[in-house]
From Swiss-Prot:
Residues 346-438, 445-532 form the Ig-like C2-type domain. Binds 1 Ca(2+) ion per heterodimer. Glycans are attached at residues 34, 77, 220, 403, 455, 630, 776, 894, 1112, 1128, 1228, 1300. Expressed in vulval muscles and in some neurons including PVQ. Expressed in the hypodermis and in coelomocytes. This is Peroxidasin homolog pxn-2. It comes from Caenorhabditis elegans. It is an enzyme of class 1 (oxidoreductase). Residues 17-45 form the LRRNT domain. Changing residue 755 to A: Suppresses the lethal phenotypes and enhances the variably abnormal epidermal morphology (vab phenotype) of the pxn-2 ju358 mutant. Residues 1-16 form the signal peptide.
Length: 1328
C-alpha cells in the first residue's frame, strides 16, 4: 500500500486543509475570516501560513501543532495581547514572523534555543518591554522592526557584536525613547553596524526624554550625550539610609525610579526596602557608584497596584507600599516593571529634519553624478527632486534609489548645470534644500605606468601593465598587432580594472606588438611593448621542420585516428551486449556521420601536434630551460604550419550555413539546427558548435591536457585528488532523505529539458591513438583515454575484474575545431573546446531532432496531416514512439530477453536511457498528434507541413512556459529567479544564448543529487503495482518494460506521487549511482559522481572558488572560511583531507556541498550559473513564446494556461487524478489530487485561420527554385515519399493499401513509404 510505503521511508504527513481556510500547495490562507482561535489540523508540510485580519487575542503553543516546515507566519492585524514564552519551539524552521498591528504589550523569550528567524515585524503594537534575549536568540536575524510602540529603553546587551555580520535592517522610530545611559549599548551597536557596511539601516528615531534632548535625532548624538542622573543620598528620621533620584523633569508624569550600575540595572546583595516615592532604603550605607533613571508614565495612566503572579506573560507589577525587599526581590527588578494602560501615546514631534544635505558640487562631462538628500520625521517623509524648479522623474537619464533619497544622473552634460532642489514632505510638513551643480574641467588621459618590452621562454607566464590617469577616469583597452583583445574566451586574462594583461603560457605566436590604449571622453593615450618568445628554440624548430615533414605528420595522424575509429566500430559489432553499460557505449558511438567528421577533425589535429612533439624531441637536443613543462608543441610551430595541419585534418570546414532567404518561413518557424534565429549573430545557439565559456579553461598545458593528466603534478601545493576517491569519501551515501514538498517529476523534467539543450560530442573511439590499445585495457593517460585509477582499498577491486588494469574506463569527450573567428588572435593557439551537438535554444529539439533529416525520420509523411509516426499503440489505443530501424542502437541486444523489442526512436538519442524519460517522450509524442489533429479540424486549408510546424512551434512554447513558470522558481528559489532571471522584457539580439560549458558539464548535473534509488510505479489507486517499484539499475535501456509492465501510467504516477531525494551535503548521491550505475549481475558498475568530476577536468573547468568569484560571492581562503558556506563540519573536514586547499575544489563537488539558498535545491554558485544560462536562453531567443511577434495575444493567453499536469492527464492511458502543480509533492494523501477535467485546458480554436498565408508549400518550392540547396531539395522530396510502392510475398502494393497478413483478420498491414507496417487489431487484443 502507498501509506505503508511512505511510512517505511519516514513520511507521515497530515494534509487536511482546515475548513475555514484555503490551501494552495504548501500555503494555507486564513486571512479575513473573523477567527478568534487558530483552527486545528493545519497540514504538517505547510511552509507559509497567513492569519492576518482576524480577531485572535493570544498566542500559545497549544494553539498550534508542531509545524517543522513552516517558514512564514503572518499574524498581522489581529488583537493579540499575550504571547506564550518559547512559542517558536513549535516552528523550528520559521524565518519570517509578522506580528504588526496588534495590541502586544510585552514580548517574552520566543525560543529555548537559537531559532531560525530572519525577519521579525512588531510594528504598531503597545509594547513597552522586550525580553533581553529576543534578538540574540535569533542568530540569522536580518530585519527587526518595532516602530510606533511604547518602548522607552532596551535591556542592556539587547544588541551584541555577534549580530553585526547578519543584522541588516533595524527600524525603531515612533517610540518615546529615553536617551540616557541605558541607550549607550544601542549607540555602540549602531556605530558597529554602520562600520561593517554603509548599506545597513539602523533607525532609532528621536528622543522624547530628557527634555534637553527632546526631538534630537538619536543617530546624531554622541555617547557623551547619553547621561543618567546622579542619585541623592539622605538619612531618614528613623536612621535608614535613603537613595533617591532627582525628579526635576517629572511634572505631569507618574514614574518609577530605576537604579543602574555601569549603565545596567543594578543587582544587589544587601537587603533593601522600597519607599512609596520609589527611593531605596537600606540599614547600611550605599557603597557602590550608582546612577538613576526613570520609567515615565503620563498623568492619565491608571496604575495597577497589585503584584501579579510571576507566571504571567507580562512582567509582575511592583508594589508602592513600603516593605522589606530581599535579595531575590531586588534581583527581579531586572525583569519586572510596572504594567500600564496608556490612553494616549506621548506626542512625537512631526518636524522634518534633513539628516544629510547635498552640498554644492561639480561634475565632468559624460560621468555619472550622484546626489543625496536624507530626511527624517514622523511620518517618514518622501523626497522629491527638482532641477531649475522642474520636477525630475525616473528615466533612462535620471535614476532614483534608496526610496528616492539618491538621484543618479548619467551622462552628466552641459545642460545639467544649474540649481537643484530636494523637497522632503510627509503630509504634515514640507522642507526643501537648494544647492548648485557646476561643470568641472576634464583631463586628457596620460599613461603613468607603461608596458615594458619583454623576452620570454615558451610556456612562461607574462604580465604586462598599463595604468593611466585622467578625468573622466580613462578606460584601458588592450590590442595585439592592432586587433583588440576580448575579455573572455581567449588565453589572455585582463584584470577587472583593465590595468594588467596576463598570458598564462606564452607561445611563439604571442611574439609581436602589444598596445594599451587609455580612452576617455576628452581624448586618448597609447603605449606599446614588444614581446619576443622563445627566439632561440623557434629558430631551431624552423630548421628541423619543412612543408613535406608537416604533410607526412598530418597523413600519419589521420591514419591513426581513422584506424582507431574503425577498430572501435568493428569491436562494437562483435561485442556481446549483456548490460545497460554495454548498450550505453553502443549509443555513445552510434552518432550521425556528419557529427563524427566534425569531432574527428579535431582529434586528427591534436594527434598531429603529438607527432610533431615526437619529431622535435627526437631531432633536437635542447635545454629544458628553453621551454616550460606541460606546454603543447603547437606553441613552437609557425602559424603557416598550424594552418596546414588544420586544413589537412579537416578542421577548417564547419557547419553548413543556411541562407535564411525564406523570410516567410523563418519569420514564423525555427530551423532545426538553430540557424536563422539571430540575424546579427548567426552562429549563436546553433547545433554542432562549441560551448561558450564563462571563464577561460584550466588545462594542464594551457592547451588541451586536463588537470591530473600528469601524475604527481601539484596545484597550490597539492595534487588534485583521485575522482573515485572523492566519490567514495564524500559523495556516495547509503542513506537518503525524501524531500518534504517536491515531487520526483522535478528531477524528471530537469532531465527532459537538459536533453533538449545539451549533448556533448563524445569521444570517437575507445582506442588509444598512441598505442592502439583499448581504453579499458590500459591505465595510461593517452588520448582519448583518461581512465580513473582505482585505489587499493576500493571495493571494485574485490570483483577481480580490475586486477590487471585497476582503473575505471573513461574516454575524453570530442573537441571542436575552433571558434570560426578569423582574427589573428584566434589563428594562433586555441585551447580545446567541446562540441554541443544540439541547439542551445529551448525549442523541443528533444522531440523533433536537431536536423531536418531527423525530423523527417520521425514524421508520418503518409497522411500529410502533420503527425509524428508510431508503430504500436497501448491498450488505450494511444501510440508509443516508433522503433529504430536502421541504427546500430538495438535494445534487443540488452540482457532482458523475455520480451525483446527494438529501441524507441525520438528526437534525442538518449530517449531510451531510463523508463521515466521514455514516458515523457511518449507523452509529448501523443500531445503533438493530439494538437495536430485538432489544428487540422479547425484549419482545413492547412497542409501537413503547416500543421506540423505550427504544432512544433506550440509544443516548444509549452516547454518554455512550464520550465520558466513552474519548474525554475522551485529549483532556483523564487528570490534567485526574480533577481537574476526576472520578468521578460523582450528579445535582445546581443544576448548570447549559447550553452555554457560550465552549465552543461557541472551546474545542471546538480539534478543527480535529486535521484531516488528506485523508480516508483503506482496503480490507479496509488498503490504499488504488482510488478513493484523498479530499482534504478534495472530501469536503464529497457523499453520492453514500458510496453509489457503497465505502460506509461504507473511510471508517471510514480513521478508525481512520490518525492524527490532531498539534496544534502552529507547525502549527495545515492549509491545506486556511485556503486551500481549500469550494473548487471557480474558487470562492474560505473560511478556517476567520479564521472562528473573527471568530466569537469576533461573540459578544463576552473575550480569552484573561481566561479564563486565570477558570481560575486565570498571566496573562502581558509577552511575556517568554509563554515558559512558549507555549514557541515564533517563535510568541510572531508574536503580538506581530499583537496588540501579550497582553491583546488572541483566545481561540481563544491557546488553540491554548498549550503542551499532559501527555497532552492542548490547553493548559490550553481544557482548563479543555471540562472545566468536560462536568462540568456530566454532573452537571446527570437522565437521565445512571449515575444509579441510569435503568437497573438489570444494565443498567448491560452499558452499561459498550459500545465504539465493537464498534458499528462490528456495523454496518459488512464490517469484521472493529479495535483494542479505537478512539481509539488503532497505526501501520502490523495486529497490534493484534482479530477483531470477540472484543470484548465488550452483552447486551440485560437489557432483558427481562414485566409492565413502559408509558408510551407509555396515558400519551400520557391527556395528550391532560388537556391537549389540540399536542404530545400529534401523538403521537396518529402511530398513524393508516399508514391513509393511495396512488395509483399511477390505482390506489388500501392502506397496506402491495407490488407490482412496471411489472411489473419487480427493482423492488418499497410504500405507506407515503400515499407510494410503491420499491427494487431484492438478487438483481437481484447479477445486475448
Amino acid at each position: 500500500m502507498l501509506l505503508e510505503f511512505l511510512l517505511l521511508i519516514g513520511i507521515s504527513l497530515s494534509t487536511a486543509c482546515p475548513s475555514e481556510c484555503r490551501c494552495a500547495g504548501l500555503d494555507v490562507h486564513c486571512e479575513g475570516k473573523n477567527l478568534t482561535a487558530i483552527p486545528g489540523h493545519i497540514p504538517i508540510a505547510t511552509t507559509n501560513l497567513y492569519f492576518s485580519n482576524n480577531l485572535l487575542n493570544s498566542l500559545s503553543k497549544s494553539n498550534f501543532q508542531a509545524l517543522p516546515n513552516l517558514q512564514y507566519l503572518d499574524l498581522s492585524n489581529n488583537s493579540i495581547r499575550d504571547i506564550e514564552e518559547t512559542l517558536l519551539d513549535s516552528f523550528p524552521g520559521l524565518k519570517y514572523l509578522d506580528l504588526s498591528w496588534n495590541k502586544i504589550r510585552y514580548v517574552p523569550k520566543l525560543s529555548t534555543a537559537p531559532n531560525a528567524l530572519v525577519s521579525l515585524n512588531l510594528v504598531h503594537n503597545e509594547i513597552s518591554r522586550l525580553d533581553n534575549d529576543l534578538v540574540s536568540h535569533s542568530p540569522y536575524m536580518q530585519t527587526f522592526l518595532i516602530q510606533r510602540n511604547r518602548i522607552q529603553s532596551l535591556p542592556h546587551d539587547f544588541f551584541n557584536s555577534r549580530m553585526v555580520p547578519t543584522l541588516k535592517t533595524v527600524k525603531m522610530a515612533g517610540n518615546p525613547w529615553s536617551c540616557d545611559c541605558r541607550m549607550v549599548n544601542v549607540k555602540q551597536f549602531a556605530d558597529s553596524l554602520f562600520a561593517h557596511s554603509n548599506q545597513n539601516i539602523f533607525i532609532v528615531g528621536k528622543c522624547f526624554f530628557p527634555k534637553g534632548l527632546r526631538n534630537y535625532v538619536f543617530r546624531n548624538l554622541s555617547i557623551e550625550n547619553l547621561e543618567c542622573e546622579k542619585p541623592e543620598y539622605s538619612k531618614t528620621d528613623d536612621g535608614m539610609f535613603k537613595m533617591s533620584c532627582p525628579n526635576n523633569e517629572m511634572e505631569g508624569y507618574h514614574y518609577d525610579s530605576i537604579f543602574l550600575e555601569n549603565n545596567k540595572e543594578a543587582r544587589h546583595t544587601a537587603h533593601f526596602a522600597r519607599d512609596k516615592d520609589g527611593s531605596l532604603l537600606s540599614n547600611g550605607q550605599f557603597t557602590r557608584n550608582y546612577q538613576c533613571a526613570f520609567y515615565r508614565q503620563k498623568q492619565s495612566i491608571h496604575m495597577q497596584k497589585k503584584m501579579q503572579a510571576s507566571s504571567s506573560t507580562e512582567p509582575p507589577i511592583t508594589t508602592t507600599t513600603m516593605e522589606p525587599m530581599t535579595t531575590s526581590t531586588m534581583d527581579s527588578m531586572d525583569t519586572t516593571e510596572s504594567v500600564v494602560t496608556m490612553t494616549t501615546m506621548p506626542e512625537i514631534d512631526t518636524k522634518i529634519v534633513f539628516e544629510h544635505k547635498q552640498l554644492d558640487t561639480t561634475s565632468r562631462d559624460g560621468e555619472t553624478l550622484e546626489l543625496k538628500c536624507e530626511a527624517s520625521g514622523e511620518p517618514t517623509p518622501t523626497i522629491t527632486w527638482l532641477f531649475e524648479k522642474q520636477k525630475l522623474t525616473e528615466s533612462r537619464k535620471h535614476k532614483l534609489t534608496k526610496n528616492g533619497s539618491v538621484l543618479k544622473i548619467f551622462p552628466f552634460l552641459n545642460t545639467d548645470i544649474g540649481q537643484y532642489e530636494c523637497v522632503a514632505s510627509n503630509g504634515e510638513e514640507s522642507k526643501s534644500h537648494i544647492f548648485s551643480v557646476s561643470l568641472k574641467e576634464s583631463e586628457q588621459p596620460v599613461i603613468i605606468d607603461a608596458p615594458m618590452d619583454t623576452n620570454a621562454t615558451i610556456g612562461q607566464q607574462v604580465t604586462l601593465r598599463c595604468n593611466a590617469k585622467g578625468f573622466p577616469v580613462p578606460d584601458v583597452v588592450w590590442l595585439f598587432e592592432g586587433i583588440r583583445i576580448p575579455r573572455r574566451n581567449t588565453r589572455y586574462t585582463i584584470s577587472d580594472n583593465n590595468i594588467e594583461l596576463t598570458i598564462e603560457k606564452v607561445t611563439r605566436h604571442d611574439s609581436g606588438v602589444f598596445t594599451c590604449q587609455a580612452v576617455n571622453s576628452v581624448g586618448s593615450a597609447v603605449a606599446t611593448a614588444n614581446l619576443l618568445v622563445g627566439a632561440e628554440l623557434t629558430e631551431k624548430v624552423d630548421k628541423l621542420l619543412d612543408d613535406s615533414t608537416i604533410e607526412k605528420i598530418a597523413k600519419e595522424a589521420k591514419q591513426k585516428v581513422e584506424k582507431a575509429l574503425s577498430s572501435t566500430k568493428d569491436q562494437q559489432r562483435m561485442d556481446k551486449i549483456e548490460s545497460p553499460n554495454d548498450l550505453s557505449k553502443l549509443f555513445k558511438f552510434a552518432i550521425n556521420l556528419k557529427k563524427v567528421d566534425l569531432g574527428k577533425a579535431r582529434e586528427i589535429y591534436e594527434e598531429s601536434i603529438r607527432l610533431v612533439q615526437m619529431h622535435i624531441d627526437n631531432g633536437l637536443a635542447f635545454e629544458s630551460a628553453m621551454i616550460s613543462p606541460n606546454v603543447s608543441y603547437e606553441a613552437v610551430l609557425p602559424v603557416s604550419y598550424v594552418q596546414t595541419l588544420m586544413e589537412k585534418s579537416g578542421c577548417q570546414t564547419g557547419q553548413f550555413a543556411e541562407s535564411c532567404e525564406d523570410h516567410c518561413f523563418f519569420s514564423k518557424y525555427r530551423s532545426y539546427d538553430g540557424q536563422c534565429n539571430n540575424h546579427e549573430h548567426p552562429w549563436w545557439g546553433v547545433s554542432e558548435m562549441a560551448f561558450m565559456r564563462l571563464l577561460p579553461p584550466r588545462y594542464e598545458n594551457g592547451f588541451n591536457t586536463p588537470v591530473g593528466w600528469e601524475k604527481g603534478k601539484r596545484y597550490n601545493g597539492y595534487e588534485v585528488p583521485n575522482a573515485r576517491k572523492v566519490s567514495r569519501v564524500l559523495i556516495g551515501t547509503d542513506e537518503t532523505t525524501p524531500h518534504s514538498h517536491l515531487s520526483a517529476m522535478t528531477m524528471q523534467w530537469g532531465q527532459f529539458i537538459d536533453h533538449d539543450l545539451t549533448l556533448t560530442a563524445p569521444a570517437l573511439t575507445r582506442h588509444s591513438y598512441k598505442e592502439g590499445a583499448f581504453c579499458n585495457r590500459t591505465c595510461e593517460n593517452a588520448d582519448p583515454c583518461f581512465n580513473i585509477q582505482l585505489e587499493a582499498d576500493d571495493p571494485k577491486l574485490h570483483t577481480g575484474l580490475y586486477q590487471k588494469h585497476p582503473c575505471m574506463e573513461f574516454e575524453r569527450n570530442g573537441a571542436a575545431c575552433g571558434s570560426g573567428e578569423t582574427s589573428p588572435i584566434f589563428q594562433r593557439v586555441t585551447y580545446r573546446d567541446q562540441l554541443n551537438l544540439l541547439t542551445s535554444y529551448l525549442d523541443a529539439s528533444g522531440i523533433y531532432g536537431n536536423s531536418e533529416e531527423q525530423a523527417l525520420e520521425l514524421r508520418d509523411l503518409y497522411s500529410d496531416h502533420g503527425l509524428l509516426r508510431f508503430d504500436i499503440v497501448s491498450g488505450a489505443n494511444k501510440p508509443y514512439m516508433p522503433f529504430e530501424k536502421d541504427s546500430d542502437m538495438d535494445c534487443r541486444r540488452n540482457f532482458s530477453r523475455e520480451n525483446p523489442i527494438k529501441c524507441f526512436l525520438a528526437g534525442d538519442v538518449r530517449a531510451n536511457e531510463q523508463l521515466g524519460l521514455m514516458s515523457m517522450h511518449t507523452i509529448f509524442l501523443r500531445e503533438h498528434n493530439r494538437i495536430a489533429s485538432r489544428l487540422l479540424e479547425v484549419n482545413e486549408n492547412w497542409d501537413g507541413e503547416t500543421i506540423f510546424q505550427e504544432t512544433r512551434k506550440l509544443i516548444g512554447a509549452m516547454l518554455q512556459h512550464i520550465t520558466y513558470n513552474a519548474w525554475l522558481p522551485k529549483i532556483l528559489g523564487k528570490a534567485t529567479y526574480n533577481t537574476i532571471i526576472g520578468e521578460y522584457k523582450g528579445y535582445n539580439p546581443d544576448v548570447n544564448p549559447t550553452i555554457a560549458n560550465e552549465f552543461a558539464t557541472a551546474a545542471l548535473r546538480f539534478a543527480h543529487t535529486l535521484i531516488n534509488t528506485h523508480l516508483f510505479r503506482f496503480d490507479k489507486d496509488f498503490k504499488e503495482t504488482k510488478q513493484g517499484h523498479l530499482p534504478l539499475h534495472n530501469a536503464f535501456f529497457a523499453p520492453e518494460r514500458l510496453v509489457s509492465e503497465g505502460g506509461v501510467d504507473p511510471l508517471l504516477r510514480g513521478l508525481f506521487a512520490a518525492p524527490i531525494k532531498m539534496p544534502r551535503p552529507d547525502q549527495v548521491l545515492n549509491k545506486e549511482l556511485t556503486e551500481k550505475l549500469f550494473n548487471r549481475f557480474h558487470e562492474v558498475a560505473l560511478d556517476l559522481a567520479a564521472l562528473n568530476i573527471q568530466r569537469g577536468r576533461d573540459h578544463g573547468l576552473p575550480s569552484w572558488t573561481e566561479y564563486r568569484k565570477f558570481c560575486n560571492l565570498t571566496v573562502p581562503k581558509t577552511w575556517s572560511d568554509m563554515k558559512n558556506i558549507v555549514q557541515n563540519d564533517t563535510v568541510i573536514s572531508k574536503l580538506q583531507s581530499l583537496y588540501g586547499v579550497t582553491e583546488n575544489i572541483d566545481l561540481w563537488v563544491g557546488g553540491v556541498t554548498e549550503k542551499r539558498t532559501a527555497d532552492a535545491l542548490m547553493g548559490p554558485t550553481l544557482a548563479c550559473i543555471i540562472a545566468d544560462q536560462f536568462k540568456r536562453l530566454r532573452d537571446g531567443d527570437r522565437f521565445w513564446y512571449e515575444n509579441e511577434e510569435m503568437f497573438s495575444k489570444a494565443q498567448l493567453r491560452q499558452i499561459k494556461k498550459v500545465t504539465l499536469s493537464k498534458i499528462i492527464c490528456t495523454n496518459g492511458d488512464d490517469i484521472d487524478r493529479i495535483q494542479r502543480d505537478i512539481f509539488v509533492y503532497h505526501g501520502n494523501s490523495t486529497q490534493f489530487y484534482e479530477p483531470c477535467e477540472s484543470l484548465p485546458e488550452i483552447n486551440l480554436n485560437m489557432w483558427t485561420t481562414c485566409c492565413d498565408a502559408m509558408c510551407s508549400s509555396s515558400s519551400t518550392l520557391a527556395r528550391n527554385a532560388i537556391g537549389g540547396d540540399e536542404k530545400a531539395k529534401r523538403r521537396k522530396r518529402r511530398h513524393h515519399h508516399s508514391k513509393k510502392s511495396c512488395h509483399d510475398k511477390g505482390k506489388r502494393r500501392k502506397s496506402g493499401d491495407r490488407w490482412n497478413h496471411s489472411n489473419d483478420i487480427c493482423v492488418e498491414c499497410m504500405c507506407h513509404d515503400g515499407e510494410v507496417w503491420c499491427k494487431t487489431n484492438n478487438f483481437c487484443k481484447s479477445q486475448v
